[in-house]
Amino acid sequence: MVLAIDAGNTRVKWGLHDGARWRARAWVATAQAGRLKAVLARLPAPELIVIANVAGSVFGDKLRQALPAAATRWLKSTRAQAGIRSSYATPAQLGVDRWAALIGAYRLFGAAAVVVNAGTALTVDALTADGVFAGGMIVPGVELMRKALQENTAGLQRRTGKFSFFPDATGDAIMSGAINASCGAIERMARFLEDAGQAAPLCVISGGGAALLAPQLNLEVKLVDNLVLEGLLTIARDDGFAARAIQKT
């Protein structure tokens, strides 16, 4: 059994994989991660735990206390891993959630793609058909954009709006603007990839805001639940110890 954990700024997502399928997947709010120890204690014991933590070192210490006894690997971004290569100037500075998502996307689709994680932040990363991470960008996520505008501009409505091509209410205008800004960043990255010789890149998108963005994108979209967990599983499978651990289950 492999337990994969994606510790983000808003949610801690986890999944237990038995080598053939996900036996369980769920999440808790990062602010309520004290519940995680009791939740994980009810699961079958894993042989290996693989973690992508972007919630900070203090949270990482708390997470360690919640983990069951097992070999544990804390992911670090590197120059090359699991079939992809990083063009980041300093590979170790790339967020481990982005690195895991890139690995997961390439293992699932093996094609040129804009790899998007729509969470608190929106990460938009370029992946070539031969597995090179060319670079990427980070912008505020839809909810963060919306809240920042409402909290820093006098007189704007607090009501959450809906998407519209031609918004005729302030709440709708804010929501539509945030969604269009996000989609514009994604589609622009796809165009950069095409200009670099990567024909018709996919958009592989995951995260809590993915369902808001996917219908508005003028790209071939692959919506993937828990892409970071898929990447962590790929990393576990590519690790010799992890392969032996999975075979024992």
Roles of regions detected by a PLM:
Residues 1-3, 45-49, 112, 197-203, ...:
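Short active-site oxyanion
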Residues 1-81:
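N-terminal glycine/serine-rich phosphate-binding loop of ATP-dependent small-molecule kinases
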Residues 1-23, 105, 111-133, 149, ...:
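Gly/Thr-rich phosphate-binding beta-strand-loop-beta motif of the actin/hexokinase/Hsp70
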Residues 11, 52-61, 176, 199-216:
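Glycine-rich phosphate-binding loops at beta-strand->alpha-helix junctions
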Residues 26, 163-202, 209, 220-222:
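Adenine-nucleotide phosphate-binding core of ATP-dependent small-molecule kinases
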Residues 52-109, 217-237:
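Glycine-rich phosphate-binding loop and adjoining helix at the ATP-binding site
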Residues 94-96, 100-103, 107-110, 134-176, ...:
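Glycine-rich phosphate-binding loop plus the immediately following alpha-helix
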Residues 154, 179, 221-249:
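Glycine-rich phosphate-binding/hydrolytic loop that grips phosphoryl groups
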